[in-house]
């Protein structure tokens, strides 16, 4: 306390902070980026290991030999699904009853806020079919789920056939201690969400559905299966769920263990695992996989049916069969054995998966980065905002500091005069107008879509996207509006106070986002922090304005799409990137209203108004 109360010591501290602030900010930002890039290199990346004792060994004998039966079921399912987009409910009921399951159906309907042009649907109605295999050795207190999504674009026939063949095989075993639910959902994720809401007796997305007539125990784990052919060259696992949630790492370890036992090739993000981590090639390949995971997790989308289970505290994975040009191929029997082994191990669980990590990054299936090792990367970036805020606070408490002299230290003999206060009224206008623009960006595109279609020759989805872009660009005129209301006798102190508030606001937002979804928080911090630190109404304003625009949330999304496709080795042209950007905007809004994805409200109600504050600072008059 003596350091802050003594004027001489406080003046010395102010000199140090003002003199070293810029070098410390640069060093902190570089350290944050370097720390993130180093996550794919040992020792920051560690080998995965099984933490749950009940799943620590693969000493189970898989007996599934129903590959031919699975193919027969798949052919029958495809034959009965003659009408595109229609699920053969009656055939599924008969087939599930024939293998000894309790069979139930659930109808659901959903009117989307605007037409989904990607899947060509607006008024959605469908029927889910599920069968329950009751555990012969216990009461129905716990259960496992094997689910297959069926959408209008792909029938997923082989996955349905394998599900029915596994149900027939499981029915003949007596060692099950948990109920097993075999679920076939209509309309992909919409059917999955409808079933989950009905199973847990809640309604969070507005889907109208019939109540479930049959239930099993509390769901402990779930596996979603997607197969496009009778043979696969590899199984790709997807872990990223809604709003960046991840399943317990032990479930992923279990999948990898049984793939290795059965000789199945398993991939992550479509990438093979690096074999040599001692050379530079292995970590660099792991860095590509890690970046792909970061980009997918940051989107907040449910990248498979498993992503919706995670919201309900159910550990889940989505497995996709890949049939490429590789020489070695595996049939449905091999895939079925891996699934049988996983379910038999999950059957041993005495409690929910909780021993291993829930927050991690994956440079490979056999390597992970824990939360304690990746969070410092974001911490270094947020330190830049804290240092700049401290610098502004000290400048505001020094009398007679001009913007040109902000970086200069005062002479030792200069007394500290009473501080000229900056009234909160001078900051109220830009803060309120910025937040009002965020509210308009959040509400108007969906509310005004019908009005836009009446006056302009556009479809509803196009109207939503164009309204989004129009409101976003209209925010650039914000400084001209706020300056008419701001009346400060000391204009330099006005923009410094506004920037101080904006820096604290941005740091709090990014810190909270990073705790919930590290990937999103890091990407936003890596892009927004430099422009936020440099924004001021003096100096090369054109350069600062260009930097602010390039690092705005919308342009960050645009650039992330190019980076994502580049990492997938499917580069985009500028026209293709723009079209994909418009589609991503529409899907982001749609997934918020349909599934509760939070990326759109975070950007519209939080980061966009904050970005407008820095834009206001830049053009302060």
UniProtKB/Swiss-Prot annotation:
The keyword Translocase does not apply. GO terms for molecular function: GPI anchor binding; GPI-anchor transamidase activity. A 2-acyl-6-[6-phosphoethanolamine-alpha-D-mannosyl-(1->2)-6-phosphoethanolamine-alpha-D-mannosyl-(1->6)-2-phosphoethanolamine-alpha-D-mannosyl-(1->4)-alpha-D-glucosaminyl]-1-(1-radyl,2-acyl-sn-glycero-3-phospho)-1D-myo-inositol binds at residues 49, 51, 354-356. Residues 1-19, 394-425, 484-495, 537-540, 620-621 are cytoplasmic. The chain crosses the membrane at residues 20-41, 371-393, 426-450, 463-483, 496-519, 520-536, 541-563, 598-619. GO terms for cellular component: centrosome; cytosol; GPI-anchor transamidase complex; mitochondrion; plasma membrane. Ubiquitously expressed in fetal and adult tissues. Expressed at higher levels in fetal tissues than adult tissues. In embryos abundant in the choroid plexus, skeletal muscle,. Disulfide bonds join 259-266. Residues 42-370, 451-462, 564-597 are lumenal. Pathway: Glycolipid biosynthesis; glycosylphosphatidylinositol-anchor biosynthesis. It is a multi-pass membrane protein. Glycans are attached at residue 203. Pfam families: Gaa1 (PF04114). One of its GO terms (biological process) is GPI anchor biosynthetic process. InterPro entries: Gaa1. It is found in: Endoplasmic reticulum membrane. Heteropentamer. Part of the GPI-anchor transamidase complex, consisting of PIGK, PIGT, PIGS, PIGU and GAA1. Interacts with PIGK. Component of the glycosylphosphatidylinositol-anchor (GPI-anchor) transamidase (GPI-T) complex that catalyzes the formation of the linkage between a proprotein and a GPI-anchor and participates in GPI anchored protein biosynthesis. Binds GPI-anchor. This is GPI-anchor transamidase component GPAA1. It comes from Mus musculus.
């Amino acid at each position: 306390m003596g350091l802050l109360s003594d004027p001489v010591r406080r003046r010395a501290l102010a000199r140090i902070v003002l003199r070293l602030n810029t070098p410390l900010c640069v060093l902190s930002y570089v350290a944050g980026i370097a720390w993130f890039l180093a996550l794919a290199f040992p020792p920051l990346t560690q080998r995965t290991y099984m933490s749950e004792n009940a799943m620590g060994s693969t000493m189970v004998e898989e007996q599934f030999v129903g590959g031919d039966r699975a193919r027969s079921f798949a052919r029958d399912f495809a034959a009965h699904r003659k009408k595109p987009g229609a699920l053969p409910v009656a055939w599924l009921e008969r087939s599930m009853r024939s293998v000894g399951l309790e069979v139930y159906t659930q109808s659901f309907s959903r009117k989307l806020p605007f037409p989904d042009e990607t899947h060509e649907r607006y008024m959605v109605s469908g029927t889910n079919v599920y069968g329950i295999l009751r555990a012969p050795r216990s009461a129905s207190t716990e259960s496992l789920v094997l689910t297959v999504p069926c959408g209008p674009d792909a029938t997923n026939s082989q996955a349905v056939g394998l599900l029915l063949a596994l149900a027939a095989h499981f029915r003949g075993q007596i060692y099950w201690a948990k109920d097993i639910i075999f679920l076939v959902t209509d309309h992909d994720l919409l059917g999955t969400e409808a079933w989950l809401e009905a199973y847990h007796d809640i309604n969070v997305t507005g889907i109208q559905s019939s109540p479930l007539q049959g239930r099993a125990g509390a769901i402990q784990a779930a596996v979603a299966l997607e197969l496009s052919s009778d043979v696969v060259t590899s199984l790709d696992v997807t872990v990223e769920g809604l709003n960046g949630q991840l399943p317990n790492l032990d479930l992923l370890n279990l999948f990898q263990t049984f793939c290795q036992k059965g000789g199945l090739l398993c991939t992550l993000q479509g990438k093979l695992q690096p074999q040599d981590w001692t050379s530079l090639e292995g970590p660099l390949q792991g860095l590509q996989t890690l970046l792909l995971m970061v980009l997918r997790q940051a989107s907040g989308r449910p990248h498979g049916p498993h992503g919706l289970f995670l919201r309900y505290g159910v550990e889940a994975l989505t497995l996709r069969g890949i049939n490429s040009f590789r020489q070695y191929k595996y049939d449905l029997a091999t895939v079925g054995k891996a699934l049988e082994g996983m379910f038999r191990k999950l059957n041993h669980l005495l409690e929910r998966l909780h021993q291993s990590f829930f927050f991690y990054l994956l440079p490979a299936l056999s390597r992970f980065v824990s939360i304690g090792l990746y969070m410092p990367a974001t911490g270094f970036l947020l330190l830049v905002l804290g240092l700049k805020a401290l610098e502004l606070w000290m400048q505001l408490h020094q009398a007679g500091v001009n913007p040109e002299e902000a970086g200069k230290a005062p002479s030792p003999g200069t007394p500290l005069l009473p501080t000229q206060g900056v009234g909160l009224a001078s900051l109220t206008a830009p803060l309120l107008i910025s937040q009002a623009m965020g509210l308009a960006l959040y509400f108007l595109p969906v509310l005004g879509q019908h009005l836009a279609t009446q006056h302009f020759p556009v479809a509803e989805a196009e109207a939503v996207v164009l309204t989004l872009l129009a409101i976003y660009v209209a925010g650039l005129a914000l400084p001209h509006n706020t300056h008419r209301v701001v009346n400060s006798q000391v204009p330099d102190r006005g923009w410094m106070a506004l920037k101080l508030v904006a820096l604290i606001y941005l740091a709090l937002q990014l810190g909270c986002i990073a705790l919930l979804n590290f990937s999103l928080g890091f990407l936003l911090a890596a892009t927004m922090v430099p422009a936020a630190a440099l924004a001021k109404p003096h100096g090369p304003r054109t350069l600062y304005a260009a930097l602010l625009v390039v690092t705005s949330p919308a342009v960050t999304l645009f650039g992330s799409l190019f980076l994502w496709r580049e990492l997938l080795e499917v580069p985009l042209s500028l026209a293709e990137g723009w079209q994909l950007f418009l589609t991503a905007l529409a899907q982001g809004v749609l997934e918020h209203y349909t599934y509760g994805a939070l990326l759109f409200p975070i950007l519209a109600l939080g980061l966009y108004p904050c970005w407008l504050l820095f834009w206001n600072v830049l053009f302060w008059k």
